[in-house]
UniProtKB/Swiss-Prot annotation:
Gene that produces this protein: glyS
Pfam families the UniProt entry points to: DALR_1, tRNA_synt_2f
Gene Ontology terms for molecular function: arginine-tRNA ligase activity; ATP binding; glycine-tRNA ligase activity
Principal place of residence: cytoplasm
Name of the protein in its database record: Glycine--tRNA ligase beta subunit
Length: 688
């Protein structure tokens, strides 16, 4: 079967830059899904995305669906004809449904008898007849939170649609998509190249669009060009461009034909903390800052223009002119804020509610101060510094800089604290209290900062759960899931000896009578432990491993992690499957036990297999206790793995529930002791 390349381009007005890539990849995925559902063979689907277009190109698309042979079985021959050999109504109805007569039906012999059967070949439809519907469905399935109408049309899309180009090889696929008739026309750049022109063949895309329309339709090509040119220009200035992936993709989504340029700002602005300058350059202007080899901000920046004049000086001057007022504002806010110490802003925190039932930000800082001190004492941090950082933790929220540039909270607190002469550990903690801000983010460096970060997050978790506002479904307005995972990461990765029950109980006490949920401690701890699952799954750890540890509910996160790592290792051992099954069997036997179970008595043992297992269990009980005390759970399970043979021999040769009570009690005691050895690490019976 011959194949052709197929092009579908949807020409629109400017698409939302932060959504462009997601829309384009979803479009390609949907097209691929629809092609598969239609049974159309193809090699691969390529996607293209620029500010005013979404496109897919299907390579090697078959020109028709494959023919299908269908077999439709009818009634049994015995039921298809009456005593006189005439077709019954059942047979005639079935034949009519197949579009044949009963006489035209074939017969199928099986070991259960003979049946009427109709076999036919259904010819596949030409691909041309299916493509409009495929593109229509693919567009309808795009993740568009808010659609719009335009002109007098009833159709809705993310932005108004002006052109639809559908080409299968050299053939135009006629039809209507989103109220627009398909054609060969594509539109070029708004200011460069040809405004619009026609394509003769799908294979001309995207090269002809670049040559005649001055549009680089390939998103990844534009992205690579911007990245490489930006790095070259930064190097030429003796620096390194700060190019974050998210901003790079947003800038890529804003331009059709990227022109990377550099500009500068006055050196006097470098007296302002770099974070504030960078915030406005990246967030407001979509510029890439440049740093020197020592990490200091240079008075230059990179921007990407969508036009490419012979003399770019006017564009450069324009961007310098635009950014200057924003940097001047930052300079003014910084100088104004320095006139008042952070500590002097504490009274203003009393005017800002943290949460109506939980009090003001001043109330929160008092709780953070106290809880940070408690945590510091347990992890070996300086209590005085931790409490001081907790007290000042939210003061920068009352500054002009943070009010205007909200993402600078924390980091501006650090700069202002340094200016005020605060201890360096205190100053750094004001910035690091918000870490980790997102998945994969760095953790607080110092133990003082860890104390404040944990205190802040646990105070929020305890307070919100304490008034009955735990996250429901996907809604999480206080970002409690992120806070819980952040706490776990800090405690585990820093190996801190903290118990969640203890910390949450202390946090609860600091709220006084504000909390209404009597089960707040258990609910917060269970919620936090539940976040382990998402974390470990992302690391590729099996769900049953996590569940085996959760079944024991260890409330020290570092200890929890050690158990998970140990069980994950145990699961790779040859004896793991058999021991997991044995633990299930032991669990079932003990659950049905109707007599008291005491200690093992070797003198009661009768069979050699039960004595061997009893001796092994007693010996291991003594061996593993020091290892459990050290938290070396991997070594514990390695030792217990040696029990496979005596356990197998026990179950092969010993009856547990015998009539003689003393013997039965002793055998149950052997199994109970065995089970408890494993349960000191995890519930191995949960493993699949």
């Amino acid at each position: 079967m011959t194949a052709q390349n197929f092009l579908a381009e949807i020409g629109t007005e400017e698409l939302p830059p932060k959504a462009l890539k997601k829309l384009a990849t979803a479009f390609a995925e949907n097209v691929e899904q629809e092609l598969n559902q239609a049974g159309l063979a193809f090699e691969k689907v390529e996607w293209f995305a620029a500010p005013r277009r979404l496109a897919v190109k299907v390579l090697g698309l078959a020109e028709a669906q494959p023919s299908k042979q269908v077999e439709k079985r009818g009634p049994a021959v015995s039921a298809a004809f009456d005593a006189e050999g005439k077709p019954t109504k059942a047979a005639e109805g079935w034949a009519r449904g197949c579009g044949i007569t009963v006489e035209q039906a074939e017969r199928l012999a099986t070991d259960k008898g003979e049946w009427l059967v109709h076999r036919a070949v259904i010819e596949g439809q030409p691909t041309k007849n299916l493509l409009v519907g495929i593109i229509d469905k693919a567009l309808a399935g795009l993740p568009i939170p808010k659609t719009m109408r335009w002109g007098d049309k009833t159709e809705q899309f993310v932005r108004p649609v002006h052109t639809v180009t559908l080409l299968f090889g050299a053939d135009l696929i006629e039809g209507e998509i989103l109220g627009v008739a398909s054609g060969r026309t594509v539109r070029g750049h708004r200011f460069l190249g040809e405004r619009e022109f026609s394509l003769d063949h799908a294979d001309q895309y995207p090269q002809l669009l670049k040559e005649r329309g001055s549009v680089v339709a390939d998103f990844n090509e534009r992205k690579a060009l911007i990245l490489a040119t930006s790095q070259e220009k930064a190097t030429a200035l003796g620096g390194v461009a700060d190019i974050e992936e998210e901003l790079l993709e947003e800038v890529t989504s804003l331009v059709e034909y990227p022109n990377v340029l550099t500009a500068k700002f006055e050196e006097r602005f470098l007296a302002v903390p770099a974070e504030a300058l960078v915030y406005t350059m990246k967030g407001d202007q979509k510029y890439f800052p440049i740093y020197d080899k020592d990490g200091k901000l240079l008075p230059h920046f990179i921007f990407v223009s969508n036009i490419n004049p012979d003399d770019p000086s006017k564009i450069i001057e324009g961007n310098e002119k635009v950014v200057r007022p924003r940097l001047t504002d930052a300079e003014f806010f910084f100088k104004t804020d320095l006139k008042q110490k952070l500590e002097d802003r504490l009274p203003r925190l009393e005017t800002v509610l943290f949460q109506q039932q939980l009090g003001t930000l001043r109330d929160k800082t008092a709780r953070i101060e106290a809880l940070a001190g408690e945590i510091a004492a347990q992890i070996g941090a300086d209590q005085t510094k931790a409490k001081r950082a907790g007290l000042l933790s939210k003061c920068d929220l009352m500054t002009n800089m943070v009010f205007e540039f909200t993402d600078t909270q924390g980091v501006m607190g650090m700069h202002y604290a340094r200016h005020d002469g605060e201890d360096e550990d205190v100053a750094v903690a004001l910035n690091e209290q918000y870490m980790p801000r997102f998945a994969g983010d760095t953790l607080p460096n110092s133990l003082v900062a860890c104390s404040v970060a944990l205190a802040d997050k646990i105070d929020t978790l305890t307070g919100i759960f304490g008034i009955g506002q735990s996250p429901k479904g996907s809604a999480d307005p206080f970002a409690l899931r992120r806070a819980a995972l952040g706490c776990l990461r800090i405690i585990v990765e820093k190996n801190l000896p903290l118990d969640l029950v203890d910390i949450v109980a202390k946090a609860t006490a600091l709220f006084g009578d504000k909390l209404t949920n009597k089960n707040v401690v258990d609910e917060v701890v269970d919620f936090m432990l539940g976040r382990f699952r998402a974390w470990y799954e992302s690391e590729g750890i099996a769900v049953d491993v996590i569940q085996s540890v959760l079944a024991r509910r260890p409330t020290k996160p570092a200890d929890f992690d050690a158990r998970v790592r140990a069980v994950s290792h145990f699961r790779t051992l040859d004896s793991a499957e058999a021991l997991a099954a044995a633990n299930k069997r032991v669990s079932n036997i003990l659950a049905k036990a109707d007599i008291a179970i005491g200690e093992i008595d070797l003198g009661v043992c009768v069979e050699s297999a039960e004595k061997t297992l009893a001796e092994a269990v007693i010996a291991l009980k003594g061996e593993v206790q020091p290892l459990i005390a050290q938290g070396d759970y991997t070594a514990v399970l390695d030792k217990l793995a040696n029990l496979r043979q005596p356990i197998d021999a026990f179950f092969d040769g010993v009856m547990v529930n015998v009539e003689e009570q003393t013997l039965r009690q002793n055998r149950l005691a052997i199994l109970s002791t065995l089970q408890n050895l494993f349960l000191q690490v995890a519930d191995i019976s949960v493993l699949q």
